[in-house]
Regions:
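A structured beta-alpha segment of the ubiquitous adenosine-cofactor-binding alpha/beta core
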Residues: 92-126
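Loop/turn elements at helix/coil->beta-strand transitions in domains of secreted/extracellular proteins
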Residues: 39-42, 67-70, 100-102, 119-124, ...
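N-terminal Rossmann-like dinucleotide-binding module
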Residues: 19-96, 260, 453-455
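Predominantly a Rossmann-like dinucleotide-binding segment in NAD(P)-dependent oxidoreductases
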Residues: 47-52, 172-178, 183-285, 293, ...
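C-terminal helical cap and adjacent loop that interface with cofactors, partners, or active-site loops
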Residues: 16-21, 28, 54, 232, ...
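N-terminal secretory signal peptides and thylakoid transit peptides that target proteins
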Residues: 1-20
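Beta-strand-loop-alpha-helix segment that lines the small-molecule cofactor/substrate pocket
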Residues: 134-185, 199
Length: 457
């Protein structure tokens, strides 16, 4: 699923593959160990917030189908978050949790200690702020661990290029890597993709997606508490800061970017966008609360994405495709159930229905784990990093277009030299200076479209 017009991108991927094939990580002497079907898989959870806790529970849920699996180590920078996560996981899977005090690791170095506690061939779950993905992935490869990466996997050009190189190194060691774009594992959407490829609604001319609701996660943040460092505050409220997560745009909109581009069978080549901040009072985060993006594919097809994080407004959380012979619902109201359908008209009325995936449907958050663990058990090739990087890049492309007020191309985003948070692999203390510093008023720099054009803040 690659822009066919894009020779520079093809040259880059070829070069990145060559670098990966010709190089080895320092100290990467630990071989990959393929676990037998009845051998216990050990799991380490790095990042113990809500998404990490959910991912760990989904991993443990595979035991009845795919063999024994146990959580043996956890790491987080906040001790209370680790304790809360451990309690929740034990409530559902007590017999599959063996995480004593000496395997509960707190601090920036905790990710290493947690992975060191897992036998080669086990699984590391990364659900920390996305800025740390490449740092943690690099160490997992060195340790010979399979990996689950929560989305997004990158937030800028330099880390995207780095992750593509690491993907090649993971392949070289036979590691299996899943990425938390779970709608790709939705069986209904998989069938919809095949139907669209078969021409059920004709040639796709337009896609559109909406994510409109009130404040979610840590998207909006007020002034920092006086007893907390900027670094810890930014990690705790990572959705508010572009260096940590790509902001709410990257962290929340990536699923619909991914599912729409999947149905098209291509990635867009450019984007232009608008966005703004409203009614924000003393908020100090970097996010806009409304975004509107027009993505363009190489063949001229358009993909329109509208996002709004604002109370009191019309809410919608859905994606659609429109073709020359009809239309399709890609998602209905959130990620699951998808309730995908095709229609012989653009009206999407019941009387025009061609096909609908039978209900109820299985949860893709569980299916993505079954697919990953099956690949580990059967030693099948499985690496979703490249697609995860591409989805992250396209999302970042739309975000940067809104934040700068410019048309941004895929090539430009991939090769952009600006790294939001260089040197994260060197940080060892929570007292380290934050990658983003506040002004004298305690507020952080925000995007200024048309004024700041070469970078987002």
């Amino acid at each position: 699923m690659r822009p066919s017009h894009d020779p520079s991108r093809r040259r880059f991927l070829k070069a990145a593959g060559g670098v990966a094939a010709a190089s080895a990580l320092p100290g990467a002497a630990i071989p990959y160990v393929h676990p037998a079907g009845n051998e216990e898989l050990q799991v380490a959870l790095i990042g113990c917030g809500g998404r990490g806790t959910g991912a760990a529970m989904d991993a443990l849920s595979t035991q009845s189908k795919l063999g024994p699996i146990k959580l043996v180590a956890m790491a987080d920078i906040f001790p209370q978050r680790l304790k809360r996560s451990l309690s929740q996981i034990r409530d559902g899977y007590a017999a599959q949790v063996d995480v004593p005090e000496d395997r509960q690791f707190i601090g920036l170095e905790g990710y290493r200690q947690a992975m060191d506690a897992v036998k080669p061939g086990g699984v590391a779950i990364f659900a920390t702020p996305p800025a740390f993905r490449w740092v943690h992935f690099q160490y997992a490869i060195q340790r010979g661990l399979n990996v689950f990466l929560e989305k997004p996997v990158t937030v800028d050009g330099p880390t995207s290029r780095r992750m593509l190189e690491l993907a090649g190194e993971a392949d070289q060691k036979g590691l299996k890597v899943g990425v938390g774009l779970m709608v790709r594992h939705c069986r209904g959407r998989q069938e919809l993709y095949e139907r669209l490829r078969g021409g059920e609604i004709g040639e796709i001319l337009m896609l559109r997606a909406y994510r409109m609701h009130g404040p979610v996660g840590y998207a909006f943040s007020g002034p920092k508490p006086p007893n907390m460092s900027d670094f810890l505050y930014q990690i705790q409220r990572f959705h508010s800061f572009l260096w940590a997560s790509g902001g709410l745009f990257s962290d929340f909109y990536i699923h619909q970017v991914d599912e729409c581009c999947w149905m098209k069978g291509a990635w867009p080549v450019k984007a232009h966008a608008t966005g703004g901040r409203h009614y924000r009072g003393d908020a100090i985060d970097q996010n806009f609360d409304s975004y509107s993006v027009e993505y363009t594919f190489a063949d001229g097809t358009k993909f329109f994405l509208d996002g709004r994080t604002m109370n009191g407004c019309h809410n919608e959380f859905a994606s659609y495709a429109h073709g020359t012979k009809g239309s399709a619902v890609i998602s209905t109201a959130g990620h699951t159930p998808g309730k995908v359908r095709t229609f012989r008209s653009q009206r999407m009325k019941d009387e025009d229905l061609i096909w609908a995936y039978p209900q109820p449907e299985r949860n893709p958050y569980q299916l993505e784990w079954e697919d990953l663990i099956e690949a580990i058990r059967q030693n099948k090739p499985y690496n979703e990093v490249r697609r995860g990087v591409e989805a992250s890049l396209v999302t970042s492309m739309g975000r940067m277009a809104a934040h700068t007020g410019r048309v941004v191309t895929y090539d430009e985003m991939l090769n952009c030299p600006h790294e939001f948070a260089p040197g994260l692999d060197k940080l060892t203390s929570p007292d380290s200076p934050a990658p983003l510093q506040p002004g004298p008023d305690g507020k952080y720099p925000i995007p200024e479209p048309g004024i700041k054009k070469d970078r987002e803040y």
